[in-house]
């Protein structure tokens, strides 16, 4: 039996690493609510939301089509994950709006904390499900995948800056 190259085997592990990095960033976002000035929160929120959006777009446009072709039995799961991405996107849009409109008082901070906690819970549920359902399939992709498809999957499993 020919073993797949280590680079491809790492895709499932890399997905988990991406999710760990995004979990840390949402935690930092919550911590930023304690800062005396919300300007840092606004900048961090924009950066965090952009990172999640880039990751999900890379999955939807790259990794998921490759997985669907290589593992057709995963199509229903991939469709469900893509629908989750829309829900997450809507939640991130709501958070971004709230951060942009928020005053610097306790009521605003409380509303922001509720929204950040909501986004964190949504992402945790999504990430856990995604890891359970597709990480092994990502790691099972073989060296026959081809450079273009491997690059698409690599983009979706790249840890955000």
Q: Whereabouts are the PLM-identified features?
A:
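Small-residue-biased structural context
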Residues: 1-161
């Amino acid at each position: 039996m020919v073993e797949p190259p280590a680079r491809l085997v790492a895709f499932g592990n890399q997905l988990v690493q991406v999710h760990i990095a995004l979990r840390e960033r949402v935690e930092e976002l919550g911590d930023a609510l304690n800062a005396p000035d919300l300007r840092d929160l606004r900048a961090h929120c924009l950066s965090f939301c952009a990172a999640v959006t880039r990751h999900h777009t890379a999955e939807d446009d790259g990794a998921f089509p490759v997985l669907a072709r290589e593992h057709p039995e995963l199509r229903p799961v991939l469709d469900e994950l893509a629908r989750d991405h829309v829900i997450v996107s809507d939640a991130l849009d709501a958070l971004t709006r709230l951060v942009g409109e928020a005053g610097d008082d306790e009521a605003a901070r409380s509303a922001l904390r509720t929204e950040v906690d909501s986004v964190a819970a949504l992402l945790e549920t999504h990430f856990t499900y995604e890891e359970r359902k597709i990480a092994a399939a990502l790691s099972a992709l073989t060296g026959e995948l081809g450079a273009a498809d491997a690059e698409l999957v690599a983009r979706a499993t790249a840890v955000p800056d």
